[in-house]
Amino acid sequence: MLHSKRREYTANNQDVTYTELKTCKSPWKHRIPTVKQSPVVLCEEQLKYGELTFHRTPQPQPRKQAMGRKRQGPKSTVWRVVTGMLGALCVVLMTTTGILLPKLFSSQEEQCRKTSLHPLRCPKDDASCDLCSSDWIAFGNNFYCVFKENTKTWAESQSACEELNSHLVIIDSKAEVENLLLFEMDGWILHKMDGTNSSWLWRNDIKIQNTLTNDSEKKNHSCHYLRGNLFMPDECSAKKSYICEFNI
């Protein structure tokens, strides 16, 4: 009886199949009657192997598609890196802009304020201008100067300012007060009590609240001077520094 077994091996993308052929002993001896041929007796078990080789056909891939995949890999990686770097740069720029813009605006406002208030110096050889003897601070069309060394009474201060073609400072607005405070100007100002209605009046008839209740105090403290952000009443005969104002 003939039996067959198959064993499969794979090497170098090839499938090799071995077929085992087995013959068994036969009780009958087969002889070939011809004289010329030698008798063949199958007495022993004989094994014969036949080798069958099958070639596996690889599936063809488009060459362009394979090359395209190889080329797309590095490019996509580079684009991702570039995109990430640009995103991080945008975040940094937005953060920096948000921090610097408020500082820039505040510095510009401060610079504009300082340019509107700047010391005025006249030429040294100009003897006709008495205002050039000291530094005057300009604010719009007004110029201010504080005389701290030679203290005078309120009347003497007003006369000294008139000799310079100016007058004691007249405060017309809150902004003017803030500018005087910025340069720390203290001294007599043109602010005097009106004896008719016992109210405090500016030179331009702008009223302020009466701070003195006693009539004797009103008469003795009828003059005003500026100290910091306060308007202090005092005796007009007291000697203090004074602030002159010159209008263009």
UniProtKB/Swiss-Prot annotation:
Residues 1-80 are cytoplasmic. GO terms for cellular component: plasma membrane. It is a single-pass type II membrane protein. Keywords: Cell membrane, Disulfide bond, Glycoprotein, Lectin, Membrane, Signal-anchor, Transmembrane, Transmembrane helix. The keyword NADP does not apply. A motif (ITIM motif 2) lies at residues 47-52. SUPFAM superfamilies: C-type lectin-like. The keyword Secreted does not apply. This is Killer cell lectin-like receptor subfamily I member 1. It comes from Mus musculus (Mouse). The gene is Klri1.
